[in-house]
């Protein structure tokens, strides 16, 4: 007999058996189909019970085989592969193939995939004209969101999302063009001429070239190129977060992927999602020196200020991505100018992890704690931080979108509500109000 949950409605005395469903890990993935609660009624004309879960803190909106997170034990896996293994042994484009296709590629498959991505990086000249229309001080993330949405008008065939070949073509285009658009957005804000993609460079090296190349050929530093590759791997996907949910929700109405990615990027734009590492840098700059860390910690414990870069909605342990980024930060600063903020960050982490106040509250460093230091060391301005998040996360969004389209259980997203407004009101003419 399958596992069930027995529910007794004290309003009627009736008993109901609700089936329990499991994912790969029963201890982590048990769920109840909330639609089964519709049968629980006081009378036949009763709508039935709804599940009330603001912000979806305990609601599984889909079945997914892309990313597994065990927040209690600090585990993150892409398609079953530990993030630590991929960060050391893989590359961003190989991980992108894994995320999109569900398996690691053969050498031939990886070569073909890399070639296709590389040779789709160029954008239409009219896209450049479109981007020229933004103010000189427009935020790069706003430019990115608008430009990705505009791509929809350049590829009208993209609306045929049930055609797998056409769908895959759009996936290639988006993964390839996002770095180009991101670099163009930066150069627009600086008043620099746009730099075209260089097919002789890798994915991350090409992005760095489009960002920083002037008149001479740009050769990326191998340490910085590898560091960016690892940072991108760590940001590819993270289960059903705000932006992934936006991608699925908008995508469920079956538009082309360009507008869905634009919607997901808009979700990422908010400071609670894609802007957290910028807030970490502001905090470290405010502290300024390791000697001021104890006083700052005291203010945090008094509730006067927040400790940025610590704690996570899912992780109740050390974020595995933060461990990798901590080591990578030291490598990056070994080839760039030394940043005293790293000393502040390390001391802040040390004190916090030894303090029962933070340990008891399960506040550990998250991915944003060190990523901002890496970006800053590589010369990226603060306003580019959410853009740098969007580049690799586009891969995850597209994988989530494709998985949703192939899932027969999925429908157009349409959550319910509990109405708390007035009952029937009588209209009053404006003269009598």
Features from the language model and the residues they span:
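Non-transmembrane, aqueous-exposed alpha-helical and coiled segments at domain scale
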Residues: 1-433
